[in-house]
Swiss-Prot record:
InterPro entries: FeoC (IPR023732), Tscrpt_reg_HTH_FeoC (IPR015102), WH-like_DNA-bd_sf (IPR036388), WH_DNA-bd_sf (IPR036390). May function as a transcriptional regulator that controls feoABC expression. This is Probable [Fe-S]-dependent transcriptional repressor FeoC. It comes from Escherichia coli (strain K12). GO terms for biological process: iron import into cell.
Amino acid sequence: MASLIQVRDLLALRGRMEAAQISQTLNTPQPMINAMLQQLESMGKAVRIQEEPDGCLSGSCKSCPEGKACLREWWALR
């Protein structure tokens, strides 16, 4: 089980990562990683970076059956 400090340190080493990548790297369940990232965000230590829909090549993200699954969410330290 990873700690909040390990999540912070991993973000410091890698720059920015997705929650799934952090979960896999630290061998910790993703819901736990999501909670830790939200805690870091509320403490002002981490920031959530969401891709803009402008990057969609087909321009049809709004009507995508996967519900914007192509838009990735990254985390980085402030």
